[in-house]
Structures are given as C-alpha cells and as structure tokens.
C-alpha cells in the first residue's frame, strides 16, 4: 500500500537525519536543512571484504560510514595494495568525487560488515541549485575535511622523506 510505503520512507528519512547529526560535515545544518539533505541520501549495507569502489573507477558520490570499518587502499609502484587510511563509524570519504568528477584515487573496501550513506553528484548538484545556502555549507564542510586530510598526509610524508636543504 502507498500509505505504508510513505510511512517507511518517512521513518527512513528520520533515521538518516539522526545519522547526519553525527557527521561534522553537517553540524552547521539544522532541522529542515537536514531533511532536505536526507532526501538526497541513499543507505547501503555491505559485507566484510566487499569493495565499495576501486581506484580508477568513476567517482560521483561521497560516503558516510554509519557502522563498521572501511579500509582505503592505494596501489604501490609494485602493484601491491597498501592501506593508507582506516575509516570507522562517523567518518566520510570520497569527498573529492563530487567536486572534480575525476576517477577514484584509491580503493575502498569493507574491513567489517558495514553500513553507510551516500550523497551522489546529481543530489549534491540539486541541493546547490535549489538550496544554495545548504550547498555552500556542505562545500565549506568538504573543504575543511580535505584541508585536514592534506595536513595529515603532508605530516605523514614529512616523516618519510629526507630534508632537501
């Protein structure tokens, strides 16, 4: 029945809003703004060992870990996969993909059974067009996350290279 479907969808949207509150990317959004974002989210569950996406795949969505642990892997020059990041509940990844439409720069694989939300490029573009203030807030949050990631990567890299001077 349509009424039951509407009730399920409404409950799922409320659940998604409750999940979004836990992510720093959305901490500046309130009430109806979170509802608008939730309308563009999709929920997924995957088993341990499952690949979410591979390095080189088309990137058009950002992921938000709700439960479980995701490994981010990068191929080395020898072709081996190296874990470059371990992402637990409350972390997001794939932020660059909704900004630049470039292929994925790494592989994401479930270390444990996991659940996550996604926001795809089309949904994000709709939010930007129809609700520019919400879109700008999300863009600022993505910029903050990417900046933090770059700082961490620079710090880790500095530990492995010799000083030039």
Task: List the predicted regions and their residue ranges.
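Cytosolic regulatory regions built on CNB/CRP/Popeye-like sensor folds
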Residues: 1-165
